[in-house]
Amino acid sequence: MIVSRIAKTLDHIDTGDVVIFHANAKQDYIKRLIGKPGDSVEYKKDQLYLNGKKVDEPYLSENKKHKVGEYLTENFKSRDLKGTNGNMKIPSGKYLVLGDNRQNSIDSRMDEVGLLDKNQVVGKVVLRYWPFNRWGGSFNPGTFPN
C-alpha cells in the first residue's frame, strides 16, 4: 500500500477516500472517510445519506453479497456517535470513518475509535497492491456529492 502524506492536512482528502490513521499509540487503521466537520451522516436500511442526500457505495457491492443478516451497515445517525454530544452534525475538527467490511470493522461507530481528530490522520491511500486481484488506486469512484 502506498500512502500520500501530502494529503495529511485533510485539505486534499475527500469523503470516500481511504485513509490511514493512528487508532491508538500502538496501531494504525485503514478506513474510508465518510463524514467531515459539519456533515450529517445517517445509515437507514443499508443506505448512506450524507447531508440528507443518498450516496451510492459501489465499493461495498461485493461485501453486500456476503453479509450476515439483513443489512451490511446497521442503522445509525451521526448524533449517536461518541463525541457528537447528540448533535446531528459532525463537530469541527472531527472526521467519521468506516471500514468497508462493515460487519467486522472497528471504526467510528465504536467508542474505542470514535470520531477522529485531524491530527490522527497519517495520510490518504493512493495505491493498493494487495491483494493482487484488487491492485490499483481507485478507492473513490466519485459517488460522493461535493
Model-found features: residue ranges?
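Soluble "head" domains of membrane/secretory-pathway proteins
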Residues: 2-146
